[in-house]
Amino acid sequence: MSQTPPSFIRLLNNTSLVSQILIGMIVGILLATLIPSAAQSAGLLGTLFVGALKAVAPVLVLLLVTDSIAGHKQGQKTSIRPLLILYLFGTFCAAVVAVVASFAFPSVLHLSAQNADIVPPGGIAEVLNTLLFNVVANPVKALLEGNYIGILAWAIALGLSLRKASDTTKAVIHDLSHAVSGIVKGVIRCAPLGIMGLVASTFAETGFSALLSYAQLLIVLIGCMLFVAFVVNPLIVFWKIKRNPYPLVLMCLKESGVTAFFTRSSAANIPVNMALCEKLRLPEETYAVSIPLGATINMAGAAITITVLSMAAVNTLGISVDLATAVLLSVVATISACGASGVAGGSLLLIPLACSLFGISNDVAMQVVAVGFIIGVLQDSAETALNSSTDVLFTAAACMAEDGSLSEGNLQEDADIV
C-alpha cells in the first residue's frame, strides 16, 4: 500500500519551479532588508548552488556531445551550421543596437585616476589566439577549468572515434550521459534555495546605492538588452520560423533567463538550458553541441556591454565618431564578444580593445572597466540572462526551421508544465 506524501512535499511538487524561484527571490529581498547579517550567511546557499552547476556542467557537456556524435546515424539532420549564423548575426545586431542607443542617449562617466590591477588582452589577435589554444587544451585541464571550447573539441573527437565502436560501448556512454542528466535535474530542483541565497547576499552587501550615480548608463545598457530580447531576437526568430515567436521567446526568458540572471554564469546555466531543450523535445544531437557552443560564442549581451561602455568613454572624452568607425566598432564588439568566455573578467576586460579604436589610452580604458565592475550587479546579471536565454531561443528556432521538430502544440503543452 503506497503512502500519501506529506502535504508540504505535495505542495512543492504541484508548484512550478519558476514560481518557487520567484518566492525565493522575495524571501531573499526580505531577509536582506530585515536581517542583513543573516542574509550574508544565506549567501552560502547561492555559492553552493552555482558551484554545483559549474561542477556538473563540464561532465554533462562532455558525455552528451560524445553520446550524440557517437550515436549519430548517417543522413540524420542537425542544425549546427544555421545556428552558427544565427549566433553571429544576433551578436552583430546587438552591437548595432548598442551603437544606435549610444548616439541617441549619450552617457558620460566620472573617471578617476584609479588603476585596476588586471591585464586586458592586447588585441583581437590575442583573443583569437587564446580561443585557438583553448581548442587544443589538455582534456583533464579543460574539464577542471570549465574550458568549454576544449571540452567540445575533445567530445567531438571522441564521439567521431566511437562511431565504429560496439553497440555495448555506445550503450554505456548513453547510460552515463543520462545518469549525469539525472544529477543535473536534482541540482536544478535546488534553484529556489540557491537563488534566495544569491539575492539575499547581493542585496545585503551592495544594495543599490552604488548604482544610482550611473543610472543613465545602466538604463541605456539594460534598455539595449531588453530591446534585443523583446524586439530584435523575436524578429530574427520570426524570419526563421515564419510564425509568432513570442511564446517561444517568453518561455526561454522565463525558464533560462531568470536562472541565468541570478547565477550570472553562462557555464552554470548550461544544464538549465539543456533541460529546457529536452522539455521542448529538441533533437539531442543538435542541442548537446549548440548549447555549450552558444555559452562560448553567442554573446549578444557582451557585445552590448563592450559597445555602450566604449561609447560612454568616447562621449566623456569628447571624441567625435563617424558612421564608418561606428560600424567598425560593431564588428570589433561582435568578434570580441565571441571571445569573452575565454577572457578572465569576461566582456569588461575586452572594453580596452574597443577603446583602442578611438586612441583611448589603456589607463583611461581601465577606469571604464572599473565603472563596469561597479554596475556589475545589474549589468552582468542582465548580460548573462540575455546571452544564455538566446542560446535556447536560437537552438529551438533553428530546429523548427530545419526539422519542424517543435510545433505550436508541443510549445503550448510545455508552457503548461512550467
UniProtKB/Swiss-Prot annotation:
One of its GO terms (cellular component) is plasma membrane. GO terms for molecular function: neutral L-amino acid:sodium symporter activity. It is a multi-pass membrane protein. The chain crosses the membrane at residues 16-36, 45-65, 83-103, 142-162, 192-212, 218-238, 289-309, 317-337, 364-384. It catalyses: L-serine(in) + Na(+)(in) = L-serine(out) + Na(+)(out); L-threonine(in) + Na(+)(in) = L-threonine(out) + Na(+)(out). Signal peptide: none annotated. Keywords: Amino-acid transport, Cell inner membrane, Cell membrane, Membrane, Symport, Transmembrane, Transmembrane helix, Transport. It is found in: Cell inner membrane. One of its GO terms (biological process) is serine transport. It holds the Pfam family SDF. PANTHER family: PROTON/GLUTAMATE-ASPARTATE SYMPORTER (PTHR42865), SERINE_THREONINE TRANSPORTER SSTT (PTHR42865:SF8). Involved in the import of serine and threonine into the cell, with the concomitant import of sodium (symport system). Belongs to the dicarboxylate/amino acid:cation symporter (DAACS) (TC 2.A.23) family. This is Serine/threonine transporter SstT. It comes from Tolumonas auensis (strain DSM 9187 / NBRC 110442 / TA 4). The lineage of its organism: Bacteria, Pseudomonadati, Pseudomonadota, Gammaproteobacteria, Aeromonadales.
